[in-house]
Amino acid sequence: MSFKDIQGQDRAIGLLRRALDRDKVHHAYLFIGPDGIGKKKTALEMAKALNCRQPGPEGGCDSCASCLKIAKNCHPDLVHLKPEKTQITIDQIRELEDQLAYPPFGGRYRLILLDKASDLNVWAANAFLKTLEEPPSGNIFALLVNDPGELLPTLVSRCLRLNFSPLSPDLISRLLITDLGSDPEKAQVISRVSGGSLGRAYHLFEKFSEEKSWDKNLESWLRQLESLSLGRLSPLIAGVKDWLGSREQMQEALEIGSTCLRDILWLRNGLEDLVFLPAKHKERLKGLAFRYPERTWLKGYDLITQAALDLLRQVNPQLTWEMLWINMARAAH
């Protein structure tokens, strides 16, 4: 892979390539944009270009020892800072500082990649700020975020911002067909609900193809939404246990919920051709669509979006789910 293989990010990659060509790479970059649109791939290609023994116009050569090690994520000068459980801690930053005290092992530069920089807790973020203010030579930082508002403003100010754009539905649809062999109709539907994220589109394609993996979660959502009409909170709160799990599992559950409400809104407005969920659920969705005013479902969609943001910000998961359903019940009555 090289820079040219990263789809839909010509502007961000163009800025980065010009800096590499002129040997004027900034010490810290902030890659901004939704997940699944090429930020991490771009950071890895930057690591290749910085340390490749035979770099070309498209970055690394993909054949030298350095490029191959980076591709396999085993290069000693590629430091991937990941959260311990749910957060990047101050102890991890201190370990990183010890590592940065030494020059790069085998390449010109060491690249420190924070795949989810928003996972820095407040103590780690403040400690990391000192590192960015006085960066040891030979070290480049790449911080990946959905929104710069997720970070301390002082951290953002130390970085050069590169904005990554959501991909167009046409591009996502074409890639689903060529890369995964999707039929055109399914590719078109998935591309419309992917939010411009190729990673999410691939994920939806796989989950949709393995329909059983969605059924349990979807059944929980339909049951909860049907329980709204009872006007009682106890069954709604009791149902929260179905969704408590890892952060990835909870985000997937919210993704299914947002898809469910989106389909309800499509059905309510007579746009059946835009419905994403399997046809066997259509009658239950139709039954829900006209049970409440449209504003109830619009409010519900916003509440799910807010719950997903709360989980990203480390809000207590059980509290997040409980407040979601309390507010959904309020919106319904």
Show the residue positions of the predicted features.
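Short capping loops/turns at secondary-structure boundaries
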Residues: 86, 118-121, 144, 148, ...
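Conserved catalytic/switch belt of AAA+ P-loop NTPases
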Residues: 101, 126-143
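Catalytic acidic motif of RecA-like/P-loop NTPases
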Residues: 115-121, 126-133, 149
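Clamp-loader machinery-focused feature within the broader ASCE/P-loop NTPase space
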Residues: 2-123
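Charged, glycine-rich active-site and insertion segments that engage polyanionic ligands
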Residues: 1-48, 66-69, 137-139, 147-256, ...
